[in-house]
């Protein structure tokens, strides 16, 4: 993964563009049971997972990247993509139980954790200076190509 760098990528007519935007915490209820989410986290002092950012997936993306694995948002960070199977109020926020591929994790989400979501976008939303995320492969011409670009709205950095 490349962060904060630059790259020239090829987008076809079919390349999907989506916005990543911040959800207003006061307007959003706690993540519902059975909702698909992706949570970037860091280990706490006792090994517990503490959310850095929570991405609420659209239903069409359920299962995307499902699992628990190292991430590069910051040194030592982890990503857990799964389904919310439980939520409990704790002194430091809300503890979410996530299930994925026959396993599960509990992650504490503090009130100040970033909460973001995706929405469909247009190519016009891709502007110079906006933060983007994409996964790319080399095409037959040796150029980087992608089928989806996620662009941050209003300065939001996509959490991927």
Go through the PLM ranges and name each one.
Residues 1-14, 18-160:
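Short, flexible, surface-exposed loop segments at domain boundaries
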């Amino acid at each position: 993964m490349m962060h904060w760098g630059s790259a020239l990528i090829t987008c076809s007519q079919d390349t999907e563009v989506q916005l990543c935007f911040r959800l207003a915490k006061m307007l959003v209820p706690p993540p519902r049971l059975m909702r698909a989410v992706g949570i970037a986290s860091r280990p706490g002092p006792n090994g517990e997972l503490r959310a850095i950012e929570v991405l609420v997936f659209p239903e069409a993306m359920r299962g995307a990247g499902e699992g628990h694995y190292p991430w590069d948002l910051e040194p030592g960070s982890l990503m857990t993509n799964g389904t919310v199977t439980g939520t409990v109020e704790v002194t430091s926020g809300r503890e979410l139980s996530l299930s994925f591929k026959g396993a599960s994790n509990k992650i504490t989400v503090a009130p100040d954790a970033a909460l973001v979501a995706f929405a469909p976008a247009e190519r016009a939303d891709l502007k110079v200076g906006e933060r983007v995320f994409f996964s790319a492969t080399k095409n037959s011409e040796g150029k980087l190509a992608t089928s989806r670009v996620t662009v941050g709205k209003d300065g939001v950095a996509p959490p991927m």
